[in-house]
Structures are given as structure tokens and as C-alpha cells.
Amino acid sequence: MCYKFYNIMVIKSLQTLVSESLKEIKTINADEAFQMVQDKNCNLIDIRESNELENTGKVEGASHIPRGMLEVYLDPNSPIFQNSQIDQNKEFILFCAGGVRSALAVKSLKDMGYQKVSHIDGGFGSIASSKFKII
């Protein structure tokens, strides 16, 4: 008897990836993030693309690491590790435009071994309507 095995590729949707990530990561709101920034207990990291910052403004006090470079910049073995820009002893709070990319990014950082990471629900949209200053 001969058996044929077929490789069937299963593609997960973006919504599935985000839903799975949200079950494993810490989500905070903009007011909680603002208080942590005021208390100097975190690294606020904007993972939006440069053109997004140019179009909508920057969040005062946030470091900018584009989503596409996040793992490279935060890999201690990378030649462009951003150790001087980021305090490794403080929580990383990530945000993007709406919260999708930051949820996936936080999951990725957790997979890399980072423990104190969270993202802001609603991203820049919720930040812009909070106490944060947009410059």
C-alpha cells in the first residue's frame, strides 16, 4: 500500500495572530502609560514608520524604533543594538497607530526573552486624546 502525504499550508489571518498575541501580552490604556512615563518607570517606544510621525506628530518623550527594525535594535547581539537609547531595567511600553502592530511587536519581544513589555490599547489614537503632548 502506498500513502501520499500532502503538505497543506495553513495561513493564519492577521486577526487570529493579534487575538492570540493579546492573550499572552500585557495591555494598558493611555492614562496608565502616561502615569508610568510621569513616574519615569518605563521606556515609551513609538514603533510607527517615520512618515506616520511626520504626518501625525510625535509623542513627547517617546523613543522611535520603527516596527521593521525593533527586533534588530533590541537584540543584544546585533551590531546596532540600541542599549544607550533604552533602559533595560524599565518596562517597555510600545505603541503604533491603532494597537495592532504594537500587540504583535510585544509578543515578538516576549518571544525574544523580554519580560517587562506592554502595549497601549488603541495606539496613537488613544494617546492623542489623552494627557500626552504631541509635538
Language-model segments: residues:
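Rhodanese-like catalytic fold shared by cysteine-dependent sulfurtransferases
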Residues: 2-42, 50-91, 100-135
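Short, surface-exposed ligand- or partner-binding patches at beta-edge/loop junctions that are enriched
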Residues: 95
